[in-house]
Amino acid sequence: MKKNKSLISFLGVFIMLFSFCFQGNVQADVNTVQSGKIKSGNVTVWEVGNVAKVLADVERLNLNTVNVPIQVDIPNVTSTNMVINQAQKQQAIILIQELLKRNIQVIVEPFPYIQQGNVGETEWNPSNINDFFWNWKTVILQDIFNSITSKYNVYGLKIASNFVNMEYAEGYWSDTIDFVRQQYKGNVLYQMNWWLTASWDPSYEAKFVEKINRPYLKKVDIVSIDSWFEVSEKRNPSYEEVKQSLFATTVYNRGQNVVQQLEQLHKATGKPVYFGGFNVPARELGLQNPWNPDVSNVFSKNVQLNGWRAYRDVLEPKPYFKGFSIWFIGSNDSTHAYQIHSQE
């Protein structure tokens, strides 16, 4: 017994020394990530300065990509005025530099920060669509071209983030993509918000069909989804129950076939499909309202684990599926529902 304790002590010291030697040179091991796939994490606009924690999460979660947001300050939900927060952008650039040093791919996302972050981006409904697109291109995207994409090897650029009230403007988006292509040679991503359909209401299906057949989606490289599908109403669904629910959701008996709809999206656009923001809160009912980290005050690691396992097992083998981005990484709040609480 004494010998074993000595051996354990020696190994512990060795591991600590080994870790110390490699501090500051975090290199994600991406060997388990399939070639051409993305295994990413999203950083929030207020945590881009947590460089050490972001790098630690990249290593812990074996990521090959990080989604770095650039804060776009917007005074209210109907505003067409917008400006990049330069102080936050400088922090983001430092993070980008550190990630690229470690061969971690970077996706840049101009992120709408409405009313000091008190209003979600899906609520943005500009009063003048022409002014919105002019400022989005010449004030926001142009700043990103000048200060980031022209200077750093950026893997991807999200040109939209859940703009549900602007996605109808097909000609404007087509023009925006052309504008982007003139100055940026990396991957152009359009990120749409998740959607609902219900077998008992055909109007939802009609909206979905309209959504996936927007002509401009064929002009981007990757179609990204902020993915918070309401899958299961059970407090603690098993792995098999979650898996089955991806083909027929049980919340309000909607019967939404998420997997089939993702394939429809791919076929309509001809583009890979990517979950550009995804997680399952480690709470009971976490798969009923995954967009709500406070859906329940009862912690459940199994809900998160079963949710992730089911999604990965179903979607990762699909050739059209590009990968996941974890919402979120880089946070020092160890008890948050969106922290990944399992080693798997």
Predicted regions span which residues?
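Short, acidic/polar
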Residues: 45-59, 133-148, 200-214, 308-314
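Aromatic-lined carbohydrate-recognition surfaces of secreted/lumenal glycan-active proteins
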Residues: 108-112, 158-162, 168, 177-208, ...
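Aromatic-rich peripheral "rim/lid" segments of glycoside hydrolase catalytic domains that contact
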Residues: 286, 290-344
